[in-house]
UniProtKB/Swiss-Prot annotation:
[4Fe-4S] cluster 2 binds at C21, C48, C51, C54. Gene3D superfamilies: 3.30.70.20. HAMAP family: PSI_PsaC. This is Photosystem I iron-sulfur center. One of its GO terms (biological process) is photosynthetic electron transport in photosystem I. Keywords: 4Fe-4S, Electron transport, Iron, Iron-sulfur, Membrane, Metal-binding, Oxidoreductase, Photosynthesis, Photosystem I, Plastid, Repeat, Thylakoid, Transport. It is a peripheral membrane protein. PROSITE patterns: 4FE4S_FER_1, 4FE4S_FER_2. The gene is psaC. GO terms for cellular component: chloroplast thylakoid; photosystem I; plastid thylakoid membrane. Apoprotein for the two 4Fe-4S centers FA and FB of photosystem I (PSI); essential for photochemical activity. FB is the terminal electron acceptor of PSI, donating electrons to ferredoxin. The C-terminus interacts with PsaA/B/D and helps assemble the protein into the PSI complex. Required for binding of PsaD and PsaE to PSI. PSI is a plastocyanin-ferredoxin oxidoreductase, converting photonic excitation into a charge separation, which transfers an electron from the donor P700 chlorophyll pair to the spectroscopically characterized acceptors A0, A1, FX, FA and FB in turn. It holds the Pfam family Fer4_21. GO terms for molecular function: 4 iron, 4 sulfur cluster binding; electron transfer activity; metal ion binding; oxidoreductase activity.
Protein backbone atom coordinates (compact mmCIF):
# COMPACT_ATOMS: atom_id res chain seq x y z
CA UNK A 1 0.00 0.00 0.00
CA UNK A 2 1.41 3.40 -0.94
CA UNK A 3 1.08 6.46 1.27
CA UNK A 4 1.45 10.11 0.42
CA UNK A 5 3.91 11.95 2.65
CA UNK A 6 3.38 15.69 2.49
CA UNK A 7 6.29 17.99 3.31
CA UNK A 8 5.54 21.63 4.04
CA UNK A 9 7.51 24.74 4.94
CA UNK A 10 8.05 24.51 8.71
CA UNK A 11 10.95 22.04 8.52
CA UNK A 12 13.91 23.08 10.70
CA UNK A 13 16.26 20.50 9.18
CA UNK A 14 16.76 18.50 12.38
CA UNK A 15 16.71 15.06 10.61
CA UNK A 16 14.61 13.47 13.38
CA UNK A 17 12.04 12.22 10.86
CA UNK A 18 14.68 10.68 8.62
CA UNK A 19 16.21 8.79 11.54
CA UNK A 20 12.78 7.65 12.80
CA UNK A 21 11.56 6.15 9.50
CA UNK A 22 11.86 2.34 9.57
CA UNK A 23 11.48 2.03 5.78
CA UNK A 24 13.91 4.77 4.69
CA UNK A 25 11.22 6.81 2.91
CA UNK A 26 12.61 10.21 3.89
CA UNK A 27 15.88 11.95 3.15
CA UNK A 28 17.26 15.44 3.64
CA UNK A 29 17.86 17.60 0.57
CA UNK A 30 19.45 21.06 0.24
CA UNK A 31 16.96 23.93 0.66
CA UNK A 32 17.59 27.61 1.36
CA UNK A 33 14.17 28.21 2.96
CA UNK A 34 15.24 27.32 6.50
CA UNK A 35 18.13 28.02 8.86
CA UNK A 36 19.56 24.50 8.53
CA UNK A 37 19.68 24.85 4.71
CA UNK A 38 18.11 21.40 4.30
CA UNK A 39 14.58 20.02 4.28
CA UNK A 40 12.96 16.60 4.56
CA UNK A 41 11.96 15.05 1.25
CA UNK A 42 10.00 11.85 0.58
CA UNK A 43 11.27 10.33 -2.68
CA UNK A 44 10.24 6.76 -1.81
CA UNK A 45 6.59 7.13 -0.76
CA UNK A 46 5.76 3.70 -2.17
CA UNK A 47 7.74 2.21 0.75
CA UNK A 48 5.79 4.12 3.43
CA UNK A 49 3.89 1.80 5.78
CA UNK A 50 1.95 4.61 7.50
CA UNK A 51 3.48 4.05 10.95
CA UNK A 52 3.69 7.83 11.59
CA UNK A 53 7.05 7.54 13.37
CA UNK A 54 8.24 10.50 11.31
CA UNK A 55 5.32 12.60 12.57
CA UNK A 56 5.94 11.59 16.17
CA UNK A 57 9.64 12.45 15.88
CA UNK A 58 9.05 15.87 14.30
CA UNK A 59 9.40 18.71 16.84
CA UNK A 60 7.49 21.20 14.63
CA UNK A 61 4.53 19.06 13.46
CA UNK A 62 5.93 19.48 9.96
CA UNK A 63 4.97 16.15 8.42
CA UNK A 64 1.62 14.74 7.37
CA UNK A 65 1.13 11.13 6.32
CA UNK A 66 -2.09 10.36 4.46
CA UNK A 67 -3.14 6.81 3.82
CA UNK A 68 -5.02 6.07 0.61
CA UNK A 69 -7.06 2.90 0.93
CA UNK A 70 -8.13 2.34 -2.65
CA UNK A 71 -11.78 3.28 -3.16
CA UNK A 72 -12.27 3.91 0.55
CA UNK A 73 -12.36 7.37 2.00
CA UNK A 74 -8.99 9.03 2.43
CA UNK A 75 -8.08 9.02 6.07
CA UNK A 76 -5.73 11.70 7.36
CA UNK A 77 -3.01 10.45 9.64
CA UNK A 78 -1.31 13.83 9.88
CA UNK A 79 -1.26 16.58 12.41
CA UNK A 80 -3.05 19.87 11.89
CA UNK A 81 -1.22 22.71 10.19
Amino acid sequence: MSHSVKIYDTCIGCTQCVRACPTDVLEMIPWDGCKAKQIASAPRTEDCVGCKRCESACPTDFLSVRVYLGAETTRSMGLAY
